């Protein structure tokens, strides 16, 4: 246990989401898909254009590049150089996954000659944060979608037992005491209190930092990569100039659709 972990005290035990949230995940994700189809054209009109810098999108636990293909196409149309993670289904940090991710990041930086923005859903967001922690000079910013990096995450996650079966805790290659600390790059955590897979309290920053922000949206966990509110947020965050990062500020209609914004 690290000194910072000792200072915070024992790991809190946070319960998983309620049965109601878990059982309605699929139905609510379907609503998000329908909302996306209805708002897709408007999204393309109001989303800020990109500057061509590279972006890598990482899938959540048990997901693959197909799961976030629609989001990647949207960002490509905004003029970003978008890439998937290219490693099939995300089963956790096993079989050298983190080493391959490091190589993937280095390759993209060499190919484009610029730092990469990382967008990660759930477990993919945790991987993104750890890459940025290890290679801050190669990562422009991190955007996590419902990623349980906070303390108490193992008790607060419905698929925790399956994850632990595939990735025994004693074999995890990442220091678990550091996960809740933000990496030294601009970092945005997008979360929903309606998350039916992981408890929302583990998906946002506990403490304020100069370059971190947590933004609350309405939606499910499984539908985050197909949520039009999140698509707009990701586009807005990616469009912020690298040397001029600023927190997201709600204005007008955004105050209704994004109910919580805090450091």
Q: Language-model segments: what does each one mean?
A:
Residues 27, 44, 53, 83, ...:
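Histidine (H) residue identity feature
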Residues 133-134, 139-263:
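Helical cap/lid subdomain of alpha/beta-hydrolase-fold lipid enzymes
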Residues 36, 62-63, 196:
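Short beta->alpha connector loops
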Residues 53-66, 70, 74-185, 190:
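Serine-dependent carboxylesterase/thioesterase catalytic core
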Residues 18-23, 28, 40, 46, ...:
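Sparse, context-dependent recognition of short Cys/His-centered cofactor- or disulfide-binding micro-motifs
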Residues 33, 104, 233, 237:
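Residues that form generic nucleotide/phosphate-binding pockets
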Residues 1-56, 68, 73, 78, ...:
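Flexible, membrane-associating and regulatory peripheral segments of lipid-active enzymes
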């Amino acid at each position: 246990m690290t000194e910072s972990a000792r200072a915070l005290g024992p790991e809190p035990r946070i319960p998983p989401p309620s049965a109601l949230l878990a059982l309605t995940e699929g139905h609510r994700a379907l609503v998000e898909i329908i909302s996306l189809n209805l708002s897709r054209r408007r999204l393309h009109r109001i989303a800020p254009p990109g500057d061509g810098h590279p972006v890598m999108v990482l899938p959540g636990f048990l997901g693959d590049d197909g799961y976030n293909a629609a989001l990647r196409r949207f960002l490509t149309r905004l003029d970003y150089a978008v890439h998937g993670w290219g490693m099939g289904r995300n089963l956790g940090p096993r079989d050298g996954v983190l080493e391959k991710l490091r190589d993937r990041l280095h390759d993209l930086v060499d190919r484009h000659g610029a730092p990469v923005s990382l967008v990660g859903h759930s477990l993919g967001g945790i991987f993104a944060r750890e890459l940025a922690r290890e290679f801050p000079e190669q990562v422009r910013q991190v955007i996590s979608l419902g990623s349980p990096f906070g303390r108490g995450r193992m008790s607060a996650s419905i698929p925790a037992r399956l994850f632990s079966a595939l990735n025994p805790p004693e074999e995890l290659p990442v220091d678990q005491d550091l996960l809740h600390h933000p990496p030294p790059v601009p970092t945005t955590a997008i979360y929903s209190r309606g998350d039916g897979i992981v408890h929302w309290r583990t998906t946002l920053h506990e403490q304020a930092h100069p370059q971190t922000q947590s933004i609350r949206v309405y939606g499910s966990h499984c539908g985050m990569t197909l949520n039009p509110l999140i698509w707009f947020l990701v586009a807005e965050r990616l469009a912020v100039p690298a040397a001029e990062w600023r927190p997201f500020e709600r204005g007008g209609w955004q105050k209704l659709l994004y109910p919580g914004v805090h450091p």
